[in-house]
Design a protein with these regions (language model features):
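Secondary-structure junction/capping motif
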Residues: 19, 69, 178-179
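Zinc-dependent metallopeptidase catalytic helix centered on the HExxH motif
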Residues: 1-14
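Beta/coil-rich, acidic/histidine-enriched accessory regions frequently appended to metallopeptidases
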Residues: 84-209
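Active-site-adjacent bridging/hinge elements
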Residues: 17-33
Length: 209
């Protein structure tokens, strides 16, 4: 499940263009109103947010030698709220988190929340004895646990687009930045009716062959 979540975020070019804070702030007019270019322009605040929480928890545990965790931080936040019944400003959560743990976490918050740099997943997971292995896999794979066979065979070529198959061809719905479809100058709403002289009756099958 974790590998699948990491893969979904890494396969989204939007992670390099939209910060986590921006994703959360614009959720109602971008994330919930996606268009044909959304995979290239936005990142899911659900998926990247979950990975950010994981990294923060592991970072706190490592830097505090196990004395604190994200759970203990959230419990203290809840106790604070019970005492005052008041909310907190946007960035006060980060300030309070550092006060509770006694740690300087500014660099992490800046990277995770306000930049488009990738999360330090490998480094954080390593503190818990987990090795993160990156493998070249087709987009349809979805991610998972690596095994001895993962690197034994080259991955199937990735078409680089989503499409809707019809009886007389395949209509592209999304074209991913940097993929084969974009490199071939294909665009959303383009219709493929022929592949190497054969009618495009099953693009997924014909492409894999």
């Amino acid at each position: 499940l974790l590998a699948q979540g990491i893969t979904r975020v890494q396969q989204t070019q939007g992670r390099l263009k939209q910060t986590l804070a921006e994703s959360s702030f614009t959720a109602w007019n971008k994330f919930y109103k996606q268009d044909e270019n959304s995979p290239n322009a936005i990142v899911s605040y659900y998926q990247k947010g979950a990975l950010t929480a994981l990294c923060l928890d592991l970072l706190i545990r490592s830097k505090s030698a196990g004395r604190h965790s994200l759970d203990s931080v959230m419990r203290q936040h809840y106790r604070d709220w019970c005492a005052t019944r008041q909310g907190i400003p946007e960035k006060q959560w980060q300030v309070r988190c550092q006060e509770i743990t006694g740690l300087n976490l500014e660099d992490f918050f800046q990277t995770a929340l306000y930049s488009t740099r990738d999360l330090p997943l490998a480094e954080c997971l390593a503190t818990a004895g987990v090795v993160l292995t990156w493998c070249a896999l087709p987009r349809s794979h979805g991610g998972g646990l690596a095994d001895a066979k993962t690197d034994s065979f080259p991955p199937a070529p990735d078409f680089g687009a989503r499409f809707k198959q019809n009886g007389d061809g395949a209509t592209l719905t999304h074209v991913f930045n940097g993929g084969s479809a974009e490199n071939a100058a294909l665009c959303p709403q383009d219709k493929i009716i022929d592949l190497n002289g054969f009618a495009c009756t099953d693009l997924a099958l014909q492409w894999s062959q």
